[in-house]
Design a protein with these regions (language model features):
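Conserved ABC ATPase "signature" region
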Residues: 95, 99, 106-124
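Conserved ABC ATPase signature
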Residues: 128-132
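Conserved catalytic motifs of ABC-family nucleotide-binding domains
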Residues: 149
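Catalytic Walker B motif of ABC-type/P-loop ATPase nucleotide-binding domains
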Residues: 153-156
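ABC transporter nucleotide-binding domain
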Residues: 171-261
Length: 305
Protein backbone atom coordinates (compact mmCIF):
# COMPACT_ATOMS: atom_id res chain seq x y z
CA UNK A 1 0.00 0.00 0.00
CA UNK A 2 1.40 3.38 -1.04
CA UNK A 3 0.07 6.78 0.01
CA UNK A 4 1.69 9.69 -1.81
CA UNK A 5 1.27 13.40 -0.97
CA UNK A 6 -2.29 12.85 0.26
CA UNK A 7 -4.23 16.05 0.96
CA UNK A 8 -7.77 16.67 2.14
CA UNK A 9 -9.63 19.71 3.46
CA UNK A 10 -13.07 20.15 4.99
CA UNK A 11 -14.60 23.61 4.52
CA UNK A 12 -11.15 24.98 3.64
CA UNK A 13 -9.68 23.56 6.85
CA UNK A 14 -6.82 21.14 6.03
CA UNK A 15 -7.22 17.66 7.50
CA UNK A 16 -4.30 16.07 5.61
CA UNK A 17 -1.32 18.13 4.45
CA UNK A 18 0.67 15.82 2.20
CA UNK A 19 0.73 12.42 3.90
CA UNK A 20 3.23 9.84 2.63
CA UNK A 21 3.12 6.25 3.87
CA UNK A 22 4.40 2.96 2.42
CA UNK A 23 3.19 -0.33 3.88
CA UNK A 24 4.78 -3.57 2.72
CA UNK A 25 2.93 -6.83 2.07
CA UNK A 26 2.49 -8.70 5.35
CA UNK A 27 3.44 -5.71 7.50
CA UNK A 28 1.71 -4.70 10.73
CA UNK A 29 1.66 -0.89 10.59
CA UNK A 30 0.35 1.55 13.18
CA UNK A 31 -0.94 5.09 12.62
CA UNK A 32 -0.72 7.05 15.87
CA UNK A 33 -2.07 10.49 16.56
CA UNK A 34 -4.29 12.52 18.88
CA UNK A 35 -7.96 13.09 18.10
CA UNK A 36 -8.38 15.09 14.91
CA UNK A 37 -4.88 14.27 13.65
CA UNK A 38 -6.11 12.79 10.34
CA UNK A 39 -6.07 9.06 11.06
CA UNK A 40 -9.70 8.31 10.23
CA UNK A 41 -9.67 10.64 7.21
CA UNK A 42 -6.72 8.68 5.80
CA UNK A 43 -8.52 5.38 6.33
CA UNK A 44 -11.78 6.67 4.86
CA UNK A 45 -9.97 7.80 1.71
CA UNK A 46 -8.37 4.37 1.32
CA UNK A 47 -11.75 2.66 1.57
CA UNK A 48 -13.66 5.08 -0.67
CA UNK A 49 -15.77 6.73 2.03
CA UNK A 50 -14.10 10.12 1.48
CA UNK A 51 -12.72 11.65 -1.73
CA UNK A 52 -9.18 13.00 -1.63
CA UNK A 53 -8.31 16.48 -2.85
CA UNK A 54 -4.80 15.64 -3.99
CA UNK A 55 -2.32 12.79 -4.08
CA UNK A 56 -2.30 9.11 -4.99
CA UNK A 57 -3.19 5.96 -3.09
CA UNK A 58 -2.16 2.59 -4.50
CA UNK A 59 -3.16 -0.85 -3.28
CA UNK A 60 -1.04 -3.60 -4.83
CA UNK A 61 0.02 -0.99 -7.42
CA UNK A 62 -3.60 -0.27 -8.38
CA UNK A 63 -5.13 3.20 -7.99
CA UNK A 64 -7.96 3.34 -5.45
CA UNK A 65 -10.04 5.57 -7.75
CA UNK A 66 -9.37 4.14 -11.22
CA UNK A 67 -9.36 0.54 -10.01
CA UNK A 68 -11.74 0.90 -7.09
CA UNK A 69 -13.43 -2.50 -7.55
CA UNK A 70 -10.11 -4.30 -7.34
CA UNK A 71 -8.67 -2.26 -4.46
CA UNK A 72 -11.79 -2.41 -2.31
CA UNK A 73 -11.95 -6.18 -2.73
CA UNK A 74 -8.46 -6.37 -1.23
CA UNK A 75 -9.35 -4.33 1.87
CA UNK A 76 -11.46 -5.15 4.89
CA UNK A 77 -12.18 -2.40 7.40
CA UNK A 78 -13.28 -2.62 11.01
CA UNK A 79 -14.53 0.92 11.50
CA UNK A 80 -15.28 2.66 14.78
CA UNK A 81 -18.97 3.02 13.99
CA UNK A 82 -21.37 0.26 12.99
CA UNK A 83 -23.34 0.82 9.80
CA UNK A 84 -25.58 -2.23 9.44
CA UNK A 85 -29.23 -3.19 9.82
CA UNK A 86 -29.67 -3.81 13.54
CA UNK A 87 -32.67 -6.10 13.08
CA UNK A 88 -30.78 -9.01 11.49
CA UNK A 89 -28.78 -11.64 13.36
CA UNK A 90 -25.01 -11.31 13.22
CA UNK A 91 -24.76 -14.54 11.22
CA UNK A 92 -27.15 -13.18 8.60
CA UNK A 93 -25.26 -9.87 8.47
CA UNK A 94 -22.00 -11.71 7.78
CA UNK A 95 -23.65 -13.64 4.94
CA UNK A 96 -24.90 -10.36 3.47
CA UNK A 97 -21.40 -8.88 3.70
CA UNK A 98 -19.90 -11.89 1.92
CA UNK A 99 -22.54 -11.57 -0.79
CA UNK A 100 -21.52 -7.98 -1.52
CA UNK A 101 -18.15 -9.37 -2.65
CA UNK A 102 -19.59 -12.21 -4.72
CA UNK A 103 -18.56 -14.95 -2.30
CA UNK A 104 -20.34 -18.23 -3.01
CA UNK A 105 -22.80 -19.56 -0.44
CA UNK A 106 -20.65 -22.59 0.32
CA UNK A 107 -17.47 -20.56 0.78
CA UNK A 108 -19.30 -17.92 2.81
CA UNK A 109 -20.69 -20.59 5.14
CA UNK A 110 -17.21 -21.96 5.84
CA UNK A 111 -15.77 -18.49 6.43
CA UNK A 112 -18.64 -17.29 8.62
CA UNK A 113 -18.42 -20.40 10.81
CA UNK A 114 -14.64 -20.01 11.08
CA UNK A 115 -14.85 -16.35 12.10
CA UNK A 116 -17.68 -16.85 14.59
CA UNK A 117 -15.65 -19.60 16.23
CA UNK A 118 -12.28 -17.80 16.27
CA UNK A 119 -13.75 -14.57 17.59
CA UNK A 120 -15.85 -16.21 20.30
CA UNK A 121 -19.15 -15.29 18.66
CA UNK A 122 -20.47 -18.77 17.87
CA UNK A 123 -23.01 -18.76 20.71
CA UNK A 124 -24.20 -15.33 19.59
CA UNK A 125 -24.77 -16.19 15.92
CA UNK A 126 -28.55 -15.94 16.29
CA UNK A 127 -28.42 -12.72 18.31
CA UNK A 128 -29.28 -9.37 16.84
CA UNK A 129 -26.60 -6.72 16.93
CA UNK A 130 -28.45 -4.56 19.44
CA UNK A 131 -28.31 -7.48 21.90
CA UNK A 132 -24.51 -7.62 21.92
CA UNK A 133 -22.19 -5.96 24.41
CA UNK A 134 -19.72 -3.33 23.25
CA UNK A 135 -16.91 -5.87 23.20
CA UNK A 136 -18.96 -8.33 21.15
CA UNK A 137 -19.78 -5.59 18.67
CA UNK A 138 -16.03 -4.94 18.25
CA UNK A 139 -15.50 -8.63 17.50
CA UNK A 140 -18.35 -8.55 15.00
CA UNK A 141 -16.73 -5.57 13.24
CA UNK A 142 -13.54 -7.57 12.77
CA UNK A 143 -15.49 -10.61 11.53
CA UNK A 144 -17.36 -8.39 9.06
CA UNK A 145 -14.06 -6.98 7.80
CA UNK A 146 -12.59 -10.46 7.27
CA UNK A 147 -15.55 -12.35 5.83
CA UNK A 148 -14.44 -11.83 2.20
CA UNK A 149 -10.87 -12.84 3.16
CA UNK A 150 -9.14 -9.57 2.20
CA UNK A 151 -5.36 -9.33 1.98
CA UNK A 152 -5.36 -6.03 3.90
CA UNK A 153 -7.14 -5.49 7.21
CA UNK A 154 -7.69 -1.92 8.42
CA UNK A 155 -8.59 -1.46 12.08
CA UNK A 156 -9.78 1.92 13.33
CA UNK A 157 -9.45 1.98 17.14
CA UNK A 158 -10.40 -1.72 17.47
CA UNK A 159 -9.98 -1.95 21.26
CA UNK A 160 -11.26 1.47 22.31
CA UNK A 161 -13.60 1.15 25.26
CA UNK A 162 -13.29 -2.62 25.70
CA UNK A 163 -12.22 -4.38 28.89
CA UNK A 164 -8.67 -5.58 29.48
CA UNK A 165 -9.45 -9.28 28.95
CA UNK A 166 -11.11 -8.70 25.58
CA UNK A 167 -8.32 -6.36 24.53
CA UNK A 168 -5.74 -9.08 25.13
CA UNK A 169 -7.91 -11.65 23.32
CA UNK A 170 -8.08 -9.34 20.29
CA UNK A 171 -4.33 -8.72 20.42
CA UNK A 172 -3.75 -12.48 20.36
CA UNK A 173 -6.05 -12.89 17.35
CA UNK A 174 -4.43 -10.00 15.46
CA UNK A 175 -1.01 -11.55 16.06
CA UNK A 176 -2.33 -14.79 14.57
CA UNK A 177 -3.63 -12.96 11.50
CA UNK A 178 -0.29 -11.22 11.06
CA UNK A 179 1.55 -14.53 11.41
CA UNK A 180 -0.70 -15.92 8.67
CA UNK A 181 0.50 -13.14 6.34
CA UNK A 182 -2.27 -10.56 6.63
CA UNK A 183 -1.24 -6.94 6.04
CA UNK A 184 -2.68 -4.85 8.88
CA UNK A 185 -3.08 -1.09 9.26
CA UNK A 186 -4.02 -0.09 12.79
CA UNK A 187 -5.03 3.23 14.31
CA UNK A 188 -5.08 3.27 18.07
CA UNK A 189 -5.23 5.40 21.20
CA UNK A 190 -3.21 2.80 23.09
CA UNK A 191 0.53 3.31 22.75
CA UNK A 192 1.07 -0.05 24.45
CA UNK A 193 -0.99 -1.65 21.68
CA UNK A 194 1.20 -0.16 18.96
CA UNK A 195 4.42 -1.16 20.73
CA UNK A 196 3.18 -4.72 21.21
CA UNK A 197 1.72 -5.34 17.74
CA UNK A 198 3.25 -3.03 15.14
CA UNK A 199 6.48 -3.54 13.23
CA UNK A 200 6.43 0.09 12.11
CA UNK A 201 4.41 3.15 13.07
CA UNK A 202 3.82 6.66 11.78
CA UNK A 203 3.06 9.50 14.17
CA UNK A 204 0.61 11.98 12.65
CA UNK A 205 -0.53 15.32 14.03
CA UNK A 206 -2.60 18.07 12.38
CA UNK A 207 -2.49 16.20 9.06
CA UNK A 208 1.31 15.88 8.95
CA UNK A 209 3.42 12.75 9.39
CA UNK A 210 6.00 13.74 12.01
CA UNK A 211 8.03 10.53 12.19
CA UNK A 212 7.99 6.97 10.85
CA UNK A 213 9.86 3.85 11.88
CA UNK A 214 9.80 0.88 14.21
CA UNK A 215 8.85 1.61 17.83
CA UNK A 216 12.32 0.48 18.90
CA UNK A 217 14.04 2.74 16.37
CA UNK A 218 11.95 5.78 17.29
CA UNK A 219 12.53 5.38 21.01
CA UNK A 220 16.26 4.92 20.44
CA UNK A 221 16.63 7.90 18.10
CA UNK A 222 14.24 10.35 19.73
CA UNK A 223 13.93 9.22 23.33
CA UNK A 224 16.18 9.81 26.29
CA UNK A 225 17.31 7.16 28.72
CA UNK A 226 17.84 7.72 32.40
CA UNK A 227 20.60 6.36 34.62
CA UNK A 228 20.39 6.48 38.39
CA UNK A 229 23.75 5.89 40.06
CA UNK A 230 23.68 5.06 43.77
CA UNK A 231 26.98 5.88 45.49
CA UNK A 232 28.26 5.13 48.97
CA UNK A 233 28.23 8.67 50.31
CA UNK A 234 26.32 11.92 50.10
CA UNK A 235 27.07 13.52 46.75
CA UNK A 236 27.01 16.98 48.29
CA UNK A 237 30.10 16.07 50.34
CA UNK A 238 32.22 15.80 47.19
CA UNK A 239 32.90 18.29 44.40
CA UNK A 240 32.18 16.15 41.36
CA UNK A 241 31.25 18.90 38.90
CA UNK A 242 34.71 19.16 37.25
CA UNK A 243 34.50 15.48 36.33
CA UNK A 244 30.89 15.45 35.09
CA UNK A 245 30.30 19.00 33.84
CA UNK A 246 29.78 17.89 30.21
CA UNK A 247 27.00 15.48 31.22
CA UNK A 248 23.31 16.16 31.86
CA UNK A 249 22.72 15.14 35.47
CA UNK A 250 21.02 16.07 38.73
CA UNK A 251 21.92 15.29 42.33
CA UNK A 252 19.69 13.82 45.04
CA UNK A 253 21.44 12.90 48.31
CA UNK A 254 23.53 9.83 47.45
CA UNK A 255 22.11 9.44 43.95
CA UNK A 256 23.13 10.88 40.60
CA UNK A 257 20.47 11.01 37.87
CA UNK A 258 21.82 11.15 34.30
CA UNK A 259 19.90 11.78 31.07
CA UNK A 260 21.67 9.98 28.21
CA UNK A 261 21.00 8.85 24.65
CA UNK A 262 22.88 5.54 24.78
CA UNK A 263 23.08 3.87 28.22
CA UNK A 264 25.44 1.14 26.98
CA UNK A 265 28.05 3.73 26.06
CA UNK A 266 27.37 6.04 29.00
CA UNK A 267 27.66 3.51 31.83
CA UNK A 268 31.38 2.61 31.36
CA UNK A 269 32.25 6.29 30.96
CA UNK A 270 30.44 7.30 34.15
CA UNK A 271 31.97 4.42 36.13
CA UNK A 272 35.44 5.39 34.94
CA UNK A 273 35.00 9.05 35.90
CA UNK A 274 33.67 8.24 39.36
CA UNK A 275 36.52 5.79 39.94
CA UNK A 276 39.06 8.56 39.25
CA UNK A 277 37.82 10.51 42.27
CA UNK A 278 37.37 7.40 44.44
CA UNK A 279 33.57 7.61 44.59
CA UNK A 280 32.25 4.21 45.80
CA UNK A 281 29.54 2.99 43.44
CA UNK A 282 26.79 0.76 44.84
CA UNK A 283 24.32 0.31 41.96
CA UNK A 284 23.20 1.57 38.55
CA UNK A 285 19.59 1.57 37.41
CA UNK A 286 18.55 2.31 33.82
CA UNK A 287 15.24 3.72 32.60
CA UNK A 288 14.42 3.99 28.91
CA UNK A 289 11.96 6.24 27.12
CA UNK A 290 8.76 4.68 25.87
CA UNK A 291 7.00 5.27 22.57
CA UNK A 292 4.52 7.36 24.54
CA UNK A 293 7.36 9.64 25.69
CA UNK A 294 8.43 10.08 22.06
CA UNK A 295 4.82 10.77 21.05
CA UNK A 296 4.44 13.46 23.71
CA UNK A 297 7.74 15.08 22.73
CA UNK A 298 6.77 15.20 19.04
CA UNK A 299 3.17 16.36 19.37
CA UNK A 300 3.12 18.10 22.73
CA UNK A 301 -0.21 16.35 23.28
CA UNK A 302 -1.63 13.35 25.02
CA UNK A 303 -2.76 10.55 22.70
CA UNK A 304 -6.32 11.09 24.02
CA UNK A 305 -6.49 14.83 23.31
Amino acid sequence: MQIKDLKKSYNNIPALKGVNINISVGEFFGLLGPNGAGKTTTINILTGLVFKDHGNCLVFDKDIVKDYRYTRSKIGIAAQELSVDWFFTIEKLLYFQAGYYGISTEKAKRKVNELLDRLGLDKKRDSRLRQLSGGMKRRFQIAKALVHDPEILILDEPTAGVDVELRHDLWKYLKELHHEGKTILLTTHYIEEAELLCENVAIIDEGIILKKGSPKKLTKELGNSGLTVQIGQNVNDVDISPFLNDLNYTIEDSRLHFSVKDPEKAIPEIIQRLAKINIPLQSIKTETSSLEDVFLDLTGKSINE
